[in-house]
């Protein structure tokens, strides 16, 4: 009986270790994917900013679908992690250029723009709340 329990315990521990390693590998893949998305968003924003010739204080409007970044149909695979990576990449580029980032919302929010308070005040935009 003790021997059987020992084998069972060993299998449970092995299973937990495998799950941990699998989870750790998946997390590392996610982090690598997030970094790649962040770099691509940064490079794309830099290229657009360079071509647009925006002056300091201008608005740079960005709108994208995290589902499409994931390779899925719009609205079918929303991802806060992807949104975070895209934002970080684009925001870094616009800050270096000295322009404001305005993020365009989806159709559920009537394509509203989300921007920093300083930019909204500069351009005289009305502040609203969404519930």
Residue ranges, per PLM feature:
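N-terminal glycine-/serine-/threonine-rich phosphate-binding loop
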Residues: 27-60, 80-92
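Glycine-rich beta-strand-to-loop/alpha-helix junction loops that act as flexible
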Residues: 62-67, 104
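Short glycine-enriched, charge-decorated loop/helix-capping segments at active-site entrances
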Residues: 74-80
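Ligand-binding beta-strand-loop-alpha-helix segment within the catalytic cores
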Residues: 97-131
């Amino acid at each position: 009986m003790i021997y059987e329990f020992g084998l069972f315990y060993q299998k449970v521990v092995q299973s937990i270790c495998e799950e941990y390693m699998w989870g750790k590998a998946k997390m590392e893949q996610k982090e690598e994917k997030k970094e790649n998305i962040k770099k691509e968003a940064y490079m794309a924003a830099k290229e657009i900013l360079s071509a647009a010739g925006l002056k300091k204080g201008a608005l740079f409007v960005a709108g994208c679908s995290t589902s499409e970044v994931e390779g899925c149909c719009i609205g079918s695979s929303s991802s806060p992690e992807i949104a975070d990576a895209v934002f970080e990449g684009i925001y870094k580029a616009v800050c270096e250029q000295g322009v404001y980032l305005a993020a365009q919302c989806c159709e559920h929010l009537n394509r509203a723009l989300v921007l920093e308070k300083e930019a909204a005040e500069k351009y005289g935009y009305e502040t609203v709340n969404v519930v």
